[in-house]
Amino acid sequence: MATETESTPNVAMSGSPPQVSFLQAFWFWLKLGFISFGGPAGQIAIMHEELVVRRRWISEKRFLHALNYCMVLPGPEAQQLAIYIGWLLHKTRGGLVAGTLFVLPSLFILIALSWVYIAFGEVPLIAGIFYGIKPAVTAIVVHAAHRIGSRALKNNVLWAIAAASFVAIFALNVPFPFIVLGAAAVGFLGGRLAPEIFKVGGGHGGADKSFGAALVDDHTPTPEHALFKWWRLIQVAVVGAFLWAVPMACLVLKFGWDHTFTQMSWFFTKAALLTFGGAYAVLPYVYQGAVDQFGWATATQMIDGLALGETTPGPLIMVVAFVGFIGGYVKAVLGPESLFLAGAVAASLVTWFTFLPSFMFILAGGPLVESTHNDLKFTAP
């Protein structure tokens, strides 16, 4: 199986790539969980290179269409994109595996590093270990910005939208959701009034480069499991509510509402719904709650946690796992003999309640998005 898996990236440009088994996809998503450095830009670039260019599991048009949806959702867009593609290829179980493996290695790594940090105080040593990674991470981000920009900004109008968005967010401090909604409105109207400009497949030069036929190609019919059905939407909503409510109810019944575990779960549920614009946009909210309101971490520990989050694989918002571990450990919520266990449980709870909404957004909204992949009003950037 290892030979089969490794042969997949070397698909020739001619002909369609072979079907991807669930096991092949499993090993890819596991690998991605360990190499997804560089924040969302770097992670999306890795997925584009592996899934669009090398393996051709999905065409660029369908990849960008899925990415457009993930960009307007709260939560980590790279992880949501992995869930979306995994779901498109292998139904619900594919999405669950892709999204879980995207986060799980980072959770284990951060639990281990958080324990070393709080138990031994060897942050300089940890920083030294990861210091050499930082230039590579920077290079990945710069390369990702160039790759995505050169392929998405295909004419002067789209460059103007990008420039206006840049000025709005950096010079005028316009909230990120308003920028995204504004760009979406321009794309929607442009797709109706000037389709030749806003067509995703348009453009000139290198932007029109084809990577060959893909498993999920531009005109591949939507698979049966991805067709929108009301009963499926209701089913996902009910299951999602159940997966949130049962752990929360158990925490309240076991520990009470004011316990650290319960308060962390409730706080990071709210934080998960506010993460428009990525981790940096929600960090002030997390800082205010974790440092000022609940005392789960100090200001210095928050900064150190962000440094660890930036130099480990996985979404940058995984810094919340560090906050959870520190809070559970310092508060000794399971007693002085179980400090590590308290930290690990807190980190796991925080991760569960932070990322659960992402799975629900994709599994519930994915069929609606798939129904628009050939509709110019919704594919226009």
Predicted segment positions?
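GIY-YIG nuclease signature motif recognition
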Residues: 80
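Multi-pass membrane proteins that catalyze or facilitate reactions on polyprenyl-/lipid-phosphate substrates
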Residues: 1-73, 84-312, 316-380
